[in-house]
Amino acid sequence: MMQIERMRPEDFDAVFRLLSQSFPAGERRDAAGQRALLSDSAYRIDILRAPSGGVQALMASWDFDDFVFFEHFAVDPACRSGGIGGQMLDALLACIPKPACLEAELPETEMAARRIGFYERHGFTVNADYPYFQPALVPGGSPLPMHLLTTGGARTAAELRAIETLLHTRVYDKTPAAMI
């Protein structure tokens, strides 16, 4: 049985190292920004601990009233393609009593297309007709075109606009109009 647990303060360095290995600087916060999020009651990081005690995988998420937003999902490069990412995602989805949402890069590269396929195999739907941009996470950065993926099927434009507004104001601390 997979043991997923909430990140402890002493796990921060290993978690941030995995985030840094898995996401370019423009798609994640710096260490101080990441650490500051840990005091937000809606934010959490769940980890899959290796038998050795290290961090094999992580999921950073935001628990909102109507959905859970999976902000960052990363698997240690040495553990990829072994099925633990899918198992962890399925286990987390089974524990939440509401829909989940995440952002994914447009399928413009083979890796981005494979990533979207992974999420589709685990119950997510790509809302491809909705134009969405992830605000810049670093000063001077550019917004990134992304797809919003949701569980429970495709969402209406009004539902996606509400999700976008909440993500931009709560997760990214920006207004949707300000990020364009």
Where on the chain are the PLM-derived regions?
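Short amphipathic alpha-helix that is part of the acyltransferase structural core
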Residues: 1-33, 49, 145, 158-178
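A short helix-loop-beta-strand connector motif used in the catalytic cores of GNAT acetyltransferases and
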Residues: 38-47
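Conserved beta-strand in the GNAT
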Residues: 47, 54-63, 67-74
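Conserved acetyl-CoA-binding loop-helix of GNAT-fold acetyltransferases
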Residues: 75, 81-94
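Conserved GNAT acetyl-CoA-binding A-motif
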Residues: 96-111
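Conserved catalytic-core motifs of GNAT/GCN5-like acyltransferases
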Residues: 103, 116, 120-140
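C-terminal "cap" of GNAT-fold acetyltransferases
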Residues: 110-113, 132-180
